[in-house]
A protein has these predicted regions:
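Conserved C-terminal helix/tail region of periplasmic/extracytoplasmic solute-binding proteins
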Residues: 309-345
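Cleavable N-terminal signal peptides
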Residues: 29-30, 40
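Pocket-lining segment of extracytoplasmic ligand-binding domains
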Residues: 101-104, 178-179, 184-273
């Protein structure tokens, strides 16, 4: 079995509303040194937070293209890998940009009024998460989950998929025995027969399917759960460095298209990063992701509102959230970055 593991979801909903001060560089002495120091001070640093699951940033970090593109613009790049706490780092201003997070998680930062701006979206991948059961299970549909033990990561996109699937099948959350387990614990429980079903995302889903001992009884298709992913940046960074943000957006878009055009090559790179998964498993997982990077549109956030309303009703979000009440950055139509849009009324 592979050593793949995902960062814990515990604590991702906490938000710390403060920004860290940056230290000043020492001044040079003498005209030549002062000139050198001024050039150094003119350069800024883009701090990027990512995880092992952050496909596009992983590839950009490996090929060095982001450093080259931003270097021309006068920026250095600093990478910060997180096993957990990425959103807290964003909320506190410890990093300027974050890698993609699933639709549901973005809502928790919004509910906490974190000073974040949405700058890109990966379009929907509805089959990249699913409800699975053992191949020999008597469960053949969501309605059969009544009274059964179902493992899911609390507050994840999969949690929304489960709640939406239960509602469509005429079941309430209390009609099933929901076990809140992180992915690694859920994997052990599922394979050990301690839960009857598991709601999980790729590449865990692909790994289980490749082992050929599971069946999918529902995924996000047929309008059940779109499973979009969002990229966010601190408000301060967006307002001060739109040129850098545009370069990042363009490179994410290009890299996403490269992954879809070169699935085998991408799998060779990602397999060891993802815990030495078989390349075929990575290819299967990536085949279900769109990797289509587009600007975020306020008029296309209906799914976010459905998730927010569902989580509010389930008591997971303490306040009502209006999905369109966010800050959005979009690339300018003529090459210059557009200004950050104001909050929707």
């Amino acid at each position: 079995m592979s050593s793949w593991s995902m960062p814990s979801f515990a604590g991702r909903r906490r938000a710390v509303l403060r920004l860290l001060c940056r230290s000043l560089l020492a001044l040079g002495v003498g005209a030549a040194v002062a000139s050198y120091s001024s050039a150094a001070l003119a350069r800024d640093t883009v701090s990027i937070g990512y995880q092992r699951s952050s496909t596009l940033f992983i590839l950009l970090k490996r090929n060095g293209e982001l450093e080259r593109r931003l270097g021309v613009l006068g920026y250095d790049v600093r990478w910060h890998e997180f096993s957990s706490g990425l959103l807290e780092a964003m909320n506190s201003g410890s990093v300027d940009l974050n890698a993609d997070v699933a639709d549901a998680f973005a809502l928790f930062t919004q509910a906490a009024h974190a000073p974040l701006t949405y700058y890109a979206e990966e379009t929907s991948a509805p089959s990249a998460q699913a409800i699975i059961v053992p191949a020999n299970s008597p469960i053949h549909g969501v309605a059969d989950l009544r009274g059964k033990r179902v493992a899911v990561a609390k507050g994840s996109g999969c949690h929304y998929l489960l709640l939406a699937a239960l509602k469509r099948a005429g079941l309430a959350p209390g009609d099933v025995d929901i076990r809140y387990l992180e992915a690694s614990d859920a994997l052990a429980a599922f394979r050990g027969g301690n839960v009857d079903a598991w709601v999980i995302w790729d590449p865990f889903l692909a790994a289980e399917q490749r082992d050929d001992h599971v069946r999918v009884i529902a995924d996000g298709r047929d309008g059940l759960a779109e499973y979009n992913r969002f990229y966010t940046a601190t408000d301060a960074f967006v307002e001060r460095h739109p040129d850098a943000l545009r370069a990042v957006f363009e490179l994410l878009n290009q890299t996403g298209r490269w992954v879809k055009a070169h699935p085998e090559e991408a799998a060779k790179i990602l397999a060891p990063v993802w815990g030495n998964l078989p390349e075929a498993t990575v290819t299967l997982a990536n085949s279900r992701r769109s990797y289509e990077i587009v600007p975020v549109r306020r008029d296309q956030l209906a799914e976010q509102q459905r998730i927010a309303d569902t989580y509010r009703a389930a008591g997971m979000i303490p306040v009502a959230v209006k999905a369109t009440d966010i800050r959005i950055w979009t690339p300018g139509p003529t090459g210059a970055a557009a200004a950050v849009k104001a909050k929707a009324p």
